[in-house]
Amino acid sequence: MPSLTALASLLALVPSALAGWNVNSKQNIAVYWGQNSANSQSTQQRLSFYCNDANINVIDIAFLNGITPPMTNFANAGDRCTPFSDNPWLLQCPEIEADIKTCQANGKTILLSLGGDSYTQGGWSSTGAAQSAADQVWAMFGPVQSGSSVHRPFGSAVVDGFDFDFEATTNNLAAFGAQLKSRTNAAGGKKYYFSAAPQCFFPDAAVGALINAVPMDWIQIQFYNNPCGVSGFTPGTSTQNNYNYQTWENWAKTSPNPNVKLLVGIPAGPGAGRGYVSGSQLTSVFQYSKGFSTFAGAMMWDMSQLYQNTGFETQVVNALR
């Protein structure tokens, strides 16, 4: 009979339906849900539909696309939500509330993604305003606070952390992130995760200051839509002139969390972004990336594209092995 230590080491290498984010694995898969970029009523199912997928560890709910004031957008999933009476841009979503709890019961790590390309508020005029906004976000999506009257889009459901996917300059974003981090650290109980989704160009203009100031658990880099993406990878050589994972590895070692992990972000289908590559091409990309201690798996945009692209998920899983 194998020892418990040996068994634990083996399980750390094997994706499981009962496992969310695994810091010791190089086979994590994170997928964004909520924007239905495939753009058909049938291409985005309710959140819980995807939580039976044993290959997916992390689901990023996209997006809280406004913060001051708060705004949500979940594409067709929002059709089953109800606007709050005093803020028609903020949705109350009992179905998503129930589904978050179902997904967490299935072992999935559920993050709320902040920003997105439709975020246009530009941030905050002062550090204090950014900190107040972070307190509000924590009250809305963290543990229910006794006596609080804040609107909670997901009711009593509590997310497992926050993803920062800002695509444009956001004033005082680092102060916002630091305050939100302090709230999660002080909460006790379960671990709350922080991730960010910069574009592959380094440094990233939108979240660069944030990730240089606030410790992240992982960075899910958008290696698409740019020459530094996976489509620029050259097989058979350790010197990459375009695909710049090495640059991000170097940054990670001096970041606020020197143990931060990196996910290679890819389009989940040909319509998800420029620079889509097939699963067979990804094998060489991932084999190269596995040579770095920071590598922890893949991120895909988005769930609707993934489920339309028959067989691609299996190809990604196999490429990560």
From Swiss-Prot:
The keyword Membrane does not apply. GO terms for molecular function: chitin binding; endochitinase activity. It is an enzyme of class 3 (hydrolase). CDD domains: GH18_hevamine_XipI_class_III. InterPro entries: Cts1-like, Glyco_hydro18_cat, Glyco_hydro_18_chit_AS, Glycoside_hydrolase_SF, Glycosyl_Hydrlase18_Chitinase. It is found in: Secreted. Its main location: secreted. Induction: Specifically induced by chitin and strongly repressed by glucose. Keywords: Carbohydrate metabolism, Chitin degradation, Chitin-binding, Glycosidase, Hydrolase, Polysaccharide degradation, Secreted, Signal, Virulence. The active site is at E167. Pfam families: Glyco_hydro_18. Optimum temperature is 40-45 degrees Celsius. GO terms for cellular component: extracellular region. SUPFAM superfamilies: (Trans)glycosidases. Belongs to the glycosyl hydrolase 18 family. Chitinase class III subfamily. Monomer. Secreted chitinase involved in the degradation of chitin, a component of the cell walls of fungi and exoskeletal elements of some animals (including worms and arthropods). Plays a morphogenetic role during apical growth, cell division and differentiation (cell wall morphogenesis). May be involved in the degradation and further assimilation of phytopathogenic fungi, namely mycoparasitism, the major mechanism accounting for the antagonistic activity against phytopathogenic fungi displayed by Trichoderma. This is Endochitinase 33. It comes from Trichoderma harzianum (Hypocrea lixii).
